[in-house]
Amino acid sequence: MEPPSNRPLTLSRIVALTIIGLLVLGLAYLCLAGSGSTVSVPSGAHAGELTLKPCHYATERGSYAADCGTLVVPENRHQAGSRLIALPVTRIRARTARPGTPVFRLQGGPGITNMEFAAASRLAAGRDVVLVGYRGVDGSVRLDCPEVDSAMRRAADLAGAKAIDAYATAYRSCAERLRSGGVDLGGYSLPERVDDLEAARRALGYRHVDLVSESAGTRTAMIYAWRYPKSVERSVMIAVNPPGNFIWYPGITDEQVRKYAKLCAHDGSCSSRTGDLAVTLHSTPVPHRWWFLPIREGNVRIATFFGLMNATPAAAGPISAPRTIDAWLAAANGDPSGLWLQSVMAQLVFPSAQVHGDLAAVARSDAAAAKRYFAGAHDHGSILGDTSSSFLFADGRIISAWPAGPDDNAYSRVRTSRVPTLLVSGDLDFATPPQTAARELLPHLPNGHQVVLKNLGHADDFWAYEPAAGSQLVNTFLASGRVDASRFTTNRIDFTPRMPQTVLAKIVLLVMVALASLTILSMLLLPLRVHRRGRVGRRSAVAIRSAGLVVIGLGGWLGGVLLALTAMPTVPLDSELLLGVSVGAPVGLTVYWAWVDRGWTAATKATGLAAALAGALVGAWLGGYAAPVPLAVLTAIAGAAAGGNLLVLVLDMVRQPAATAAPARTRTSPSPA
């Protein structure tokens, strides 16, 4: 073995320390960039004050000139002297010198930001497009409920009885914590949100505005038109949700299932797999396992309902309705792999999909309907059951868990509106079926129209399918009140998706097992190599302690996920502890075995092992907090690599001067006589 250099800071160590420093700075930036609210009430501000400055807004057609700023509003307009809160406002400027009536865009949800709208470029050619942040989601006060998030993440089954109990308790605890922290929950309602929009309209100096809303956002648009009819010129509602319909009623859902069953019966590939799709969906049991992997029935039924919302793969990707149906048909024929994939995706996605405090506050808009629905036997043997409604409303208990507000019953029934309104529905939409809008809202719109798009589903389908046709429909109506759906063609439902969930599931499992096995194999081969050869070669060690750690860390995490799925059902798959240990331990051991020399003393080896493991575990834990999953996996690996390598480098620099300062043991020749 070559004698060690007597210089603690060699060129290679300087390079390594520089790379580690850059990794640490990058992780620190991610932590700081993702923390805290970016909106606050300016000093000395008053209610209704709007401050704007030039900015740019990213759209699907590139960056558009815009104005960004803050609107100050009272937290609760029912309370004199209520404190002020701030909301973000973005105005994407019209691309014309003579713009038409500006449009306010209203996102769905609940619990989803109103500040992201890449399709703004489809509307901004002739008018300003304005985004006003939703109170409770986008503003200086955010109704986050980590109690609810945690209860969902730790649920053995998202729709299980124990989980529902935990959700109700968590919502109550969240409300109590927010109130004790000074949040006036009575101010977080849809009418208050509408008053925010009206305040923005006045502050911007607009005489009238148009509204383009979708899904839950259509309820806000309805209330705006009922509350301020003179302020709204025209309204386009996509995926319409009249009062009382935040609940998904099993009977109406059955009507939508039968539409798919009819399409299936006329499709050769689908009809060859089932005589009646509706019967197959109703009668096929959810198996407990796929091979050694458990399948959680409640997760599957929730994922199935959401998977059936959108009919086009462009809108829904791997969870589109054709893929969801294909997974059930495969399960009916003995291959439940697609249902396992649905179960895992539900477990990963739903706990963090929404701001749950806003969901609870908005759900109270349908408090009366929810009480009626959940008071009796609400599922009478329907095809899919009512698992999704029970999950969303915690079996109705969210209504009692979240405090009542002064606006709960203000708009619980449909009112008449003379605002020219266009209702746009997909005929296969499970969340907001077109027949509901036709029966419950359209009769109350003397100047209303409805367009039902054949073989399309929820709002995402509208934006993804034939964008030019959708833009013409919306822009023509906003400009003239005329309905022009002439450019739409009928979507064809493909019951043989190119990448079915069954194939995706097998690919996912193969990758998980392969990388986990590679990590385990590396943990066995590296010590064996050190035992046989004394140490890992310098070039190999550099490769292993850098790029190799990405594979080792990823395989470690996937192995941890497999362990959690099979043996620890209440451990969240995105658990910080699971991530830290499953990444940190193999990365630390790999750093150690790529660093150690067989000839070193036992004390040096033990110190090195402790340093590598401690640095990697702490680094993985800290890195896991730098970003949300799945990006957190990479930041945890980066943190583990930085921590493990840093401590063994420091150990090298500390011990090397001492080693070189020790007297050399040399063999001398005897002097001649």
Protein language model features and the residues they cover:
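Catalytic active-site module of serine/aspartate enzymes centered on a nucleophile-bearing elbow/loop
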Residues: 454-513, 657
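Conserved acidic catalytic loop of the alpha/beta-hydrolase fold
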Residues: 179, 191-208
